[in-house]
């Protein structure tokens, strides 16, 4: 095991022990100072980001969009920290309490997870969001970003650590692994003595690599092969507005819609309308045989398309015979992130919500709302697509666990 990595783990554990005892007022004051220091040092961050962007000129636009940092995005990061400071602190919160037949008082209390490892790709905002959420919830964080964002992440973490140091707070609450090799990532995934949970942030390949390699417990997040189903009873104007929003507003993010399913009864009427609306925004459509017959500019779909998260202005279209056919298709190909039905029939809408096996299931709303901020959680550390511990947008509450505190007055078990 890499000795530098072990040293990082030990420092993180030590910081986590201190953070677990830190009061809410101190944490909130620190977060506000972190936000101010990001703004104060924005030129340093942008200069570092320019180095990363210069090395990524051959990468697709969807990649550089996630990588790019400017004054507005730094302001957004800072505002995210301020929002977290305003949120309720779940640590030390008592979920419930009771007295047993033997007179023992039992309290179920929220406590931090400990040390959280984040493995992520080219999203510098993750560095700041993760630091804010882990710090407020009393956890230390070890960050390992992709090589494409190494200069930006290094600058961000340097500023965050210097801010903590100036406040006489544990600087090792946030640490960055600057070795971006796969070998060090694999060792991090197995640092069970020091890391309590791993959260991968990125595409499906990264997430699956972490899930299959790690011996540290993993919260699986966010690949988003998201679907919108237009029911036979849908308001077609609403359906058009929601579909365009879900696909076009920000196609590179995990809650953007990638697939459009349309009930056969309305396909001839609706598909030409939605195809025109999407194509006006530069969306390339790929469809099944029926879709291609209805709109000649739609390209034939392949089996691989149904399983693909495009993160781009591409959308696959399928015509289905029934609500159950739509549900079956979605449950087979979905990454269990976010799906939506557009319908005026509330019974069919509720049935869809119950039958779909995804973290977030909408009726008559865009999948783009799957977001910690939109849910009222503040910034999120990721969107969990698994069922154990946390599911959906993960805010402060999801970064804690429970502890039972039992108080007696001399009881012994008979």
Swiss-Prot record:
Q: What is its EC number?
A: 1.2.1.41
Location of the protein in the cell: Cytoplasm
Give any Pfam family that matches: Aldedh
Query: Which reactions appear under catalytic activity for this entry?
Result: L-glutamate 5-semialdehyde + phosphate + NADP(+) = L-glutamyl 5-phosphate + NADPH + H(+)
Task: Please give the PROSITE patterns that the UniProt record associates with this protein.
Answer: PROA
Record key words, sorted:
Amino-acid biosynthesis, Cytoplasm, NADP, Oxidoreductase, Proline biosynthesis
SUPFAM superfamilies, per database record: ALDH-like
Q: What is this protein called?
A: Gamma-glutamyl phosphate reductase
Q: Which HAMAP family match?
A: ProA
What function is annotated for this protein? Catalyzes the NADPH-dependent reduction of L-glutamate 5-phosphate into L-glutamate 5-semialdehyde and phosphate. The product spontaneously undergoes cyclization to form 1-pyrroline-5-carboxylate.
Locate the transmembrane regions by residue number.
none
Q: Identify the main location.
A: cytoplasm
Give Gene Ontology CC terms: cytoplasm
Gene that this sequence comes from: proA
| UniProt pathway annotation | Amino-acid biosynthesis; L-proline biosynthesis; L-glutamate 5-semialdehyde from L-glutamate: step 2/2
At the top level, the lineage of the source is Bacteria
A GO biological process this protein is involved in?
L-proline biosynthetic process
């Amino acid at each position: 095991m890499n000795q530098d990595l072990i040293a990082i783990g030990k420092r993180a554990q030590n910081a986590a022990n201190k953070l677990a005892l830190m009061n809410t007022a101190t944490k909130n004051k620190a977060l506000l100072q972190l936000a101010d220091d990001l703004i104060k040092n924005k030129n340093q961050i942008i200069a570092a980001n320019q180095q990363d962007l210069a090395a990524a000129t051959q990468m697709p636009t969807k990649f550089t969009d996630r990588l790019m940092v400017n004054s507005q995005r730094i302001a957004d990061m800072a505002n995210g920290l301020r929002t977290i400071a305003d949120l309720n602190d779940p640590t030390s919160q008592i979920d419930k309490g009771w007295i047993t037949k033997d007179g023992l008082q039992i309290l179920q209390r929220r406590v931090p997870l400990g040390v959280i490892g984040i493995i992520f790709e080219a999203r510098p905002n993750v560095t700041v969001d993760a630091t804010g959420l882990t710090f407020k919830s009393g956890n230390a964080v070890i960050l390992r970003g992709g090589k494409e964002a190494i200069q930006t992440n290094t600058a961000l973490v340097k500023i965050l650590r210097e801010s903590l140091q100036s406040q006489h707070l544990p600087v090792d609450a946030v640490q960055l692994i600057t070795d971006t090799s796969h070998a060090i990532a694999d060792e991090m995934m197995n640092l069970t003595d020091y890391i309590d949970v791993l959260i991968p942030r990125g595409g499906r390949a990264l997430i699956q690599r972490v899930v299959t390699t790690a011996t540290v417990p993993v919260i699986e997040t966010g690949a988003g092969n998201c679907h919108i189903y237009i029911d036979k009873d849908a308001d077609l104007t609403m359906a058009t507005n929601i579909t365009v929003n879900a696909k076009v507003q920000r196609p590179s993010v995990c809650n953007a819609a990638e697939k459009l399913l349309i009930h056969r009864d309305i396909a001839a009427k609706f598909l030409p309308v939605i195809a025109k609306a999407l194509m006006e925004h530069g969306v390339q459509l790929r469809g099944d045989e029926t879709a291609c017959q209805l709109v000649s500019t739609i390209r034939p779909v392949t089996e691989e398309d149904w399983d693909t998260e495009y993160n781009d202005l591409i959308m696959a279209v399928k015509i289905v015979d029934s609500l159950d056919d739509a549900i079956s298709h979605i449950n087979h190909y979905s990454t269990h992130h976010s799906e939506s039905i557009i319908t005026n029939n509330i019974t069919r809408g509720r049935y869809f919500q119950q039958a779909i096996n995804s973290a977030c299931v909408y009726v008559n709303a865009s999948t783009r709302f799957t977001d910690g901020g939109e849910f009222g959680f503040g910034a999120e550390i990721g969107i969990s697509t698994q069922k154990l511990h946390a599911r959906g947008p993960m805010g402060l509450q999801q970064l804690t666990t429970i502890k039972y505190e039992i108080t007696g007055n001399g009881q012994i078990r008979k």
